[in-house]
């Protein structure tokens, strides 16, 4: 009987820890500078994923001028996408202002896109990105000098998969994408939350192991089963196009140090890795050094890299 009581207490602790963390340790608000959709110039587009028979929507940001332009297809992070998400819009507007076309799709099951990301594997989501690339290749409104992909957060898992399947991509960018499995990433995230709450390392490790496996599985069982053991490293090993991978040293969602270590161990000459001190999962400006939702150094790094890769 006592054993079951103990198990029940542990399970309840694991289930409610994320809520407690948010209530007891709320993040200190920062007045980040956010780009609003109303402040951008864009076209609403629609295209089709013929592989999985899905109608998809999105926003197309085209620079001023005649081109040719490099173009980037954004691969979304986890969850439902929103067209007014300031993180994505900050990147899209910067690239557009610097002569780069950006296709920001509606993630399947979001906004104007059919399908359901909750029951889709990374391989499924990669077909949506391939469809977006096909759309850009087929359009005749403006000339392009090259097309690449930008995987943001979870999209960093998908980006190298797309690069393996699509011929003639000009570049690949991963913004705070994990180089560990989703199982490892969830364990890292839960462990951090528990440590912040005051649990000792040994206890937090055990509770995080149970919590990361059970809470996410209960919330989204189909998705968890599809992606939990996905390993991105075999795809990164064979990447043969110019690739830029950016991490935030203070990322509490993705184990940036371990991710950078694994990537560097591949010794792939096509991959450039950079870690920004003082930035977390958004690659935001460090405290006291501005309030950009994505630090300007990272934005400049991405736009400069894309132009260089597209010109090769």
Predicted features by range, described:
Residues 27-28, 167-216:
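Hydrolase active-site cap/lid region
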Residues 27-65:
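N-terminal cap/lid segment of alpha/beta-hydrolase-fold proteins
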Residues 81-92, 107, 257:
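The serine-hydrolase catalytic nucleophile loop
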Residues 92-112:
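Conserved alpha/beta-hydrolase
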Residues 119-140:
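Alpha/beta-hydrolase active-site loop
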Residues 239, 245-247:
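Short beta-strand/loop motif that positions the catalytic acidic residue
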Residues 241, 255-265:
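Short alpha-helix in the alpha/beta-hydrolase fold that links the catalytic acid
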Residues 279-283, 288-312:
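Catalytic active-site module of serine/aspartate enzymes centered on a nucleophile-bearing elbow/loop
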């Amino acid at each position: 009987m006592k054993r079951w009581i103990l198990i029940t207490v542990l399970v309840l602790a694991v289930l409610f820890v994320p809520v407690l963390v948010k209530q007891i340790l709320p993040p200190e608000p920062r007045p980040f500078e956010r780009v609003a959709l109303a402040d951008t110039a864009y076209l609403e587009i629609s295209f089709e994923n013929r592989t999985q028979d899905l109608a998809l929507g999105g926003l197309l940001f085209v620079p001023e001028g005649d081109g040719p332009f490099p173009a980037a297809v954004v691969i979304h992070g986890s969850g439902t996408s929103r067209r007014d998400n300031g993180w994505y819009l900050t990147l899209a507007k910067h690239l557009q202002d610097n002569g780069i076309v950006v296709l920001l799709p509606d993630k399947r099951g979001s906004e104007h896109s059919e399908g359901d990301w909750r029951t889709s594997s990374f391989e499924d989501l990669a077909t949506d990105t391939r469809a977006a690339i096909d759309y850009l290749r087929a359009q005749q409104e403006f000339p392009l000098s090259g097309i690449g992909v930008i995987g943001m957060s979870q999209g960093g898992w998908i980006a190298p998969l797309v690069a393996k399947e699509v011929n003639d991509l000009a570049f690949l960018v991963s913004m705070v994408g994990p180089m560990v499995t989703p199982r490892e990433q969830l364990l890292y995230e839960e462990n951090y939350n528990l440590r912040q709450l005051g649990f000792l390392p040994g206890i937090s490790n055990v509770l995080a192991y149970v919590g990361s496996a059970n809470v996410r599985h209960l919330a989204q069982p189909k998705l968890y089963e599809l992606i939990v053991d996905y390993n991105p490293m075999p795809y990164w090993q064979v990447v043969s196009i110019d690739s830029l991978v950016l991490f935030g040293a203070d990322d509490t969602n993705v184990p940036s140090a371990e991710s950078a270590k694994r990537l560097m161990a591949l010794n792939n000459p096509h991959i450039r890795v950079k870690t920004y001190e003082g930035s977390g999962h958004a690659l935001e400006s460090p405290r006291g050094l501005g309030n950009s939702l994505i630090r300007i150094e990272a934005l400049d790094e991405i736009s400069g890299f894309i132009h260089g890769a597209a010109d090769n």
